[in-house]
A protein has these predicted regions:
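A composition/biophysics-driven feature that prefers long, compositionally simple stretches
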Residues: 1-159
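Short, charged/polar low-complexity linear motifs in solvent-exposed/disordered segments
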Residues: 35, 59-62, 167, 175, ...
Length: 238
């Protein structure tokens, strides 16, 4: 964003589902047919840097990454290109992850798109496939643990709803209602909103994706609310 402020980081959902790592510049390489068994499952992280950590906070070390992900082989991002050069010559097919959300926009090239194009230039004779199609099918079946996490997101959202049900009265602003919701999310250890909350009073309730939330709520008006907590990588939607 403007100046030296940063947009809040949100991890790729497939990567988080596979590794549990919630840190930027992370990659996962899976090569089950690698002749070197050590490099069949590789987690790629940014090398910890004392100066960068002073500004941006702690970065995972090898032991921490292993504990979170269950992956033994950890390599640093600045060395992955040289390793890929060796591994890829022993493979015929390359699967790359892409954001296949049906509502995704195409206004600008994403980092992942540029990386895919770079791979095709570096290794033009390989066969390329979509890993997102596979992960989408796998992620559709939730484990008991995932169900517990989703239920926690639901429970936090319910607490927020009950809070605002007691708070709402004529004369409050839509953004005050949103503030109560976010407060309840954060105090219950949610990472925040799953998406921008809609608090639409009066005529604004007819706007499907109204997100300004800056008008006063008047006596007798309907208030349309659409919000949900994000917890453990899962969003609720009320």
């Amino acid at each position: 964003s403007n100046g030296d402020a940063l947009y809040k980081f949100v991890q790729n959902s497939d990567l988080y589902w596979l590794t549990g790592i919630d840190q930027e510049d992370t990659m996962l390489v899976l090569f089950p047919d690698n002749t070197d068994e050590k490099y069949r499952e590789i987690l790629v992280l940014v090398r910890p840097n004392e100066l960068k950590e002073k500004w941006d906070g702690h970065r995972l070390n090898v032991q921490e990454a292993r504990q979170i992900s269950g992956i033994e082989t950890i390599v640093w991002l600045d060395s992955i290109d040289a390793l890929l050069q060796v591994w890829i010559h022993n493979a015929d097919n390359i699967y790359l992850d892409t954001n296949e959300n049906d509502r995704k926009g195409f206004h600008s090239e994403t980092r992942e798109y540029r990386y895919i194009q770079e791979m095709k230039i570096r290794f033009p004779l390989h066969n390329y496939f979509r890993s997102a199609k596979i992960s989408k099918e796998l992620r559709a079946i939730k484990t008991p643990y995932e169900v517990e996490v989703i239920q926690q997101a639901i429970d936090i959202t319910e607490k927020a709803f009950r809070r605002v049900a007691q708070f709402i009265k004529p004369g409050v602003y839509e953004y005050e209602i949103e503030a109560e919701i976010v407060y309840e999310f954060l105090r219950n250890r949610a990472s925040g909103e799953g998406y921008s909350s809609i608090i639409a009073s009066g005529d604004r309730a007819r706007t499907l994706h109204y997100i300004y939330n800056n008008e006063i709520c008047k006596d007798g008006e309907l208030i349309l609310m659409d919000f949900g907590a994000r917890y453990g990588g899962y969003n609720d939607d009320l």
